[in-house]
Amino acid sequence: MSNFNVGFVIFPDLTQLDFTGPLQVLARLPQSTTHIIAKSEAPVPSDCGLSLVPTHTFANCPALDLICIPGGVSGVIGAIGDRETVAFVRQQAGSAKYVTSVCTGAFVLGVAGLLKGRRATTHWAYTDLLSLVGATYEKSRIVKDGNLITAGGVTAGIDFGLSVVAEIAGEVIARTIQLGIEYDPVPPFDSGHPDRARAAVKSALSSRYEKANLALRAGIEQATIL
């Protein structure tokens, strides 16, 4: 395989694990170069306070073989309202072999016009909004529709990264990366999905996510969908 350009588009207030989870996996893809792309060279603050340093700007980014958009509701609302960001994503996706997202990053793809008529997933709290960008929700942690690969919320980015490596370089390489990062999750609680979480746990989050859902809906409705 010739050198494979992987690019993550970052923006203020993104959820860092949406980005750093798959980054840790895809940075180990053989014969690849990882690019971290933002509007400018300035450090980009994430939603947990960790600042991220771009390697490229929109102006000097090479053509990408894989483009990945992380999520984070506040950051995504800003990104979909920024025409330069949306245009860059659409332009790079036009020639990329793989167009991908983690969590609510799917809505950046959607506003860029890349989810129309496609199957996709996102964080469980926002799946009802996928239809606003022309996508059909598929209930799965990872959804592949042609060259479009979307992942569920936050930690799904690690599973996504391993799935993409298997797609590109084969299962053996993906398995060696999984072992190398000791990805063998055994969570202390079985509350990682609404289908399994107790009612009291879901109730504790309901107000927060209802407000976030409404905010993201408003952001999508105000955005110019390409």
Predicted segments, located by residue:
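Extended, subdomain-level signal for the structured scaffold at the beginning of enzyme domains
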Residues: M1-V99, A106-V111, T127-L129, Y137-K139, ...
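Thr-Gly-centered strand-to-loop micro-motif
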Residues: P54, K144-D145, A151
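Residues at secondary-structure transition points
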Residues: A79-R83, T121, G152
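Structural detector of well-ordered beta-strand residues that form the stable sheet scaffold
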Residues: V99-T100, T121, E138, I149
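A conserved active-site-flanking secondary-structure segment within enzyme catalytic domains
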Residues: L115-I142
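Alpha-helix boundary/capping and short turn/kink residues
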Residues: A120, V154, E167-E171
